[in-house]
Amino acid sequence: SRETLSIINEKGGEAILFKADLTKSDEVQKLKAFCVEKCGCSLDILINNSGGLIARKKLAEQDEAFYDSVMDLNFKSLFLVSNAFVGMIPSGGAVVNLSSLAARDGGGGGSSLYAASKGAITTYTRSLAKELGPDGIRVNSVCPGLINTTFHDIFTPDEARKRVAESTPLRREGTSEDVANLVYFLASDNAAFITGANYDINGGLAFS
């Protein structure tokens, strides 16, 4: 995050950092208060980008605590942030949620709860698009496939990554820049008539 902050500032932008546990309501409220103090009461774009796999576990290996940790990290955090900040978004604003290809196809081995939590995000995106549309607020999500990030560095074996990348029409993994460009588009006025959409970005690995 500090590296990203430096890049933004070096390119003439202005960015700030605030550390918070987005699975806890009181922490989200502290984040909101910080944003109001630093940036005022208006928020044109909200990008919900928290989440993670935590671990690959089959059903027999999962317990209630693991269920709660995965759902809290991926879906509860998105709910709490959206709930806290939606009142600050004016007409013409946009929300972009980070879902996953796993929401479409159930994910890889040991990721059933992760896939379910991301599936909740795709449905929630559609619901919020209907609810917030009359207020002029658009809500969309992106569903990345195999992206070259620390997520797969940690949880996906190199051989499996190579096999999957070679099976895509574009014959490569995606990059964080690929995903960021799509998020930028959906947040911009170029997507002014798009809402409730869950955009695949996976190099043709899967179609929906």
Predicted regions and their residues:
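Alpha-helical segment proximal to the catalytic Tyr-Lys
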Residues: 87, 130-134, 192
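Active-site loop-to-helix junction immediately N-terminal to the catalytic Tyr of the SDR YXXXK motif
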Residues: 62, 106-115, 127
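Short C-terminal tail/terminal secondary-structure segment
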Residues: 56, 183-184, 195-208
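Active-site helix of classical SDR
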Residues: 82, 117, 125
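Substrate-binding pocket helix/loop in short-chain dehydrogenase/reductase
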Residues: 57-59, 63-69, 152, 164
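Residue(s) in the substrate-gating loop at a strand-loop-helix junction
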Residues: 100
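Short-chain dehydrogenase/reductase
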Residues: 1-42, 54-55
